[in-house]
Amino acid sequence: MTPLSSPLSQYWQTVVERLPEGFTETSLSVQAKSVLTFSDFALDSVIAHPEWLAELESASPQADEWRHYAGWLQEALAGVCDDASLMRELRFFRRRIMVRIAWAQTLSLVDDETILQQLSHLAETLIVGARDWLYAACCREWGTPCNPQGVPQPLLILGMGKLGGGELNFSSDIDLIFAWPEHGETRGGRRELDNAQFFTRLGQRLIKALDQPTMDGFVYRVDMRLRPFGDSGPLVLSFAALEDYYQEQGRDWERYAMVKARLMGDNDDAWSRELRAMLRPFVFRRYIDFSVIQSLRNMKGMIAREVRRRGLKDNIKLGAGGIREIEFIVQVFQLIRGGREPSLQSRSLLPTLDAIAALHLLPENDVAQLRVAYLFLRRLENLLQSINDEQTQTLPADDLNRARLAWGMKAENWPQLVGELTDHMANVRRVFNELIGDDEADTPQEEERSEPWREVWQDALQEDDSTPVLAHLADEERRQVLTLIADFRKELDKRPIGPRGRQVLDQLMPHLLADVCSREDAAVTLSRITPLLAGIVTRTTYLELLSEFPGALKHLIMLCAASPMIASQLARYPLLLDELLDPGTLYQPTATDAYRDELRQYLLRVPEEDEEQQLEALRQFKQAQLLRIAAADIAGTLPVMKVSDHLTWLAEAMIDAVVQQAWTQMVARYGQPAHLDERQGRGFAVVGYGKLGGWELGYSSDLDLIFLHDCPMDVMTNGEREIDGRQFYLRLAQRIMHLFSTRTSSGILYEVDARLRPSGAAGMLVTSADAFADYQQHEAWTWEHQALVRARVVYGDPQLTSQFDAVRRTIMTTARDGKTLQTEVREMREKMRAHLGNKHRDRFDIKADEGGITDIEFIAQYLVLRYAHEKPKLTRWSDNVRILELLAQNGIMDEHEAQALTVAYTTLRDELHHLALQELPGHVAQTCFSKERALVQASWRKWLVAV
């Protein structure tokens, strides 16, 4: 065993002072001194449980002792009588065994592969032990879940990721998916439950037993987000539901995740065999699947973006050449060829590496280097985490922990360890890059083209200097360009740019100037780009991105030239530069029905319990998607209707994620309202009004929302901190508003306006569905019924959605006096015009002036409220374009008039989108859109001016 280094020998004196009575310095073995000096976790544990140290001193941990874990846990749980004592014993057992593993790992008593095996078996043992105890307890309470034939149904648990692969790290969380075989009901209990309810309750209790922090800590952080539909899906799924999902909706990234999936307990019963057989075709295709390559490229970009976004230069998992890249290399071959090569179907990385070598898919030397690097990195990761039982992969900055790791990795000192680490990660990165090889590089022609611009950049030409490369520009344009360059250089003098940043900037600027100054609008474009560059000069990573990827630079120039809004966004949030790397996705926004899934995948990379990171990730995702929508808008690949569709689908995905996050936080604190035990869903709905309800969002639109619940009176929550059920929903709505409006470094998510709720700002933030119906029928003003025309549920379970739709239909199909309605709608419009009157008399306000967008909206709303009692089909849609279509189809409005209003409406909205991209207000010269305005005014007079 390597003697303690000098810094650690000195630290030993601090350890001695903390030892419990009875343990003297001389009574401890050299091994004990080494472990207790290395790991604060081990030291804290033996201080609390001195008997563990005596046990370790008398009998060292063995390589195969994982075989005894199940028996040891069974003994520990023998006296457990309730959930509280179960949680206590699970935490005690986990800590005791983890100290043994830390001891064996620190002293290298067991090889590193076996350490990974022990960590994984411990987790599996605890999961299965807790499940089995809780299953029996739930059966005593509610009966045994059975299928229609009376066969008992088990809860099957898929361990995902490193747990499934038998490669768990020291302080890992665990990714699980719960399933049960067949529908049915419980039998033999005090009350019957259907199987879905039984297994959901069992799953909730199991997660609580493992995940909930107590005075004894927790067992594992449990992450359930890999299940179908993520947090918005059922906690537990039947086999049939799982099969439907993976056949119909399973994504590529879910295939990657499923490669490592393993049933906890490794049972070989009929149910387990059925589940394995059902999942295998989804993961491994029968043919050689080269479609993986594009997904592979996307994943590579995702890794690179994550490293840049989170500044992970010292991260041995996510950094360049880190653990994730090795896992990624191996999965590539599994997914491409695994269906044809059974040897590639292993869940574990090292056996799969051996198969890759045997199949000659990589050179033997590369495989050998990857194997050595993997074991080196995994040992370093586990040692790092065992210091404090902390989930981290970032190298320490303090001298003590650096000395600990250097000693634990058998290096002379920290610089030697860093040198070895750098070599291993460089080998991994080389193989990783060669596997895809899609990095861009400058061609000799591009170098030759940019060379003359080096003089312009580096020699600080004055306004009256002449240079051949600027000769094509007009005098004023040339002067502006030179002034902008000179001002930018002066700005740089105020910034703390290091030598590397200066070097990269000097490489980048000639290329940038060559591209910008070839444009007719060179000065305008450069004036938009230099603020962005000034903002990132101290962040060399982003300069390197633009320097190393010429395509990204070209897209940056094109988008900034087209839109100051995009230029401003990029300057405020430079992480969006990552989106420029792939033109295939930049100009092709996410499919309208895929935003929720894309966001779910994006959020999986963020710890579920880290609220701050979750808030940042939501905002970053929104900004990236907005950039892609705007880029497609500028490129002309999205018509105006589609722009709004995409912006609306994006907003709905964000609402879904925010509600999920708020719900999770509230349930963790209070439990859920007890009435939900008797129904599916959450008893909560979010209704979108205005532009959101009408599928007409713009780039900077806020969200008009109201919140509904169906909680009866006198219902309490079922958590340890009970509160009134209706109070729960009020706090939930407040939490949602907070998550939307909290300002982080990435800004706010959306401005949310909830004043359209019953009684407006004076009313309760969240309303019961019954109270909402009563208000709409007996108290609401006509303008509130107009608003209801453009309202729809944007988040909610089917039961509440149906209830809201029925209320909306009832209100809209109520017969009204035509004259009274006409007067009220017209007077409301006149009030709005007086209140929001155009302050630019020589300009036409596209939205608010006569003949503008609001007039068209009022015409549509008036006609729906006037005629829906005769033509109920008019209530079907909430957007103006389809309402106009319905008015024509149902004979209310002449088809020619409806078509003309639709064209006018989309034309005006298109102009508003483009003005937003130019960061211009929504008004134009009075001479603009005269034809459209005249048409709208004529229609207004026809329908809303009294005869």
Swiss-Prot record:
Which GO cellular component terms, listed alphabetically, does the Swiss-Prot or TrEMBL entry include?
Answer: cytosol
One GO biological-process annotation of the entry reads:
regulation of glutamine family amino acid metabolic process
Nucleotide-binding recorded as keyword: yes
Q: Which GO terms describe its molecular function?
A: [glutamate-ammonia-ligase] adenylyltransferase activity; [glutamine synthetase]-adenylyl-L-tyrosine phosphorylase activity; ATP binding; magnesium ion binding
One Pfam family for this entry, by name?
GlnD_UR_UTase
Q: Which PANTHER family match?
A: BIFUNCTIONAL GLUTAMINE SYNTHETASE ADENYLYLTRANSFERASE_ADENYLYL-REMOVING ENZYME (PTHR30621:SF0), GLUTAMINE SYNTHETASE ADENYLYLTRANSFERASE (PTHR30621)
Q: Which family does it belong to?
A: Belongs to the GlnE family.
Identification of the protein by name:
Bifunctional glutamine synthetase adenylyltransferase/adenylyl-removing enzyme
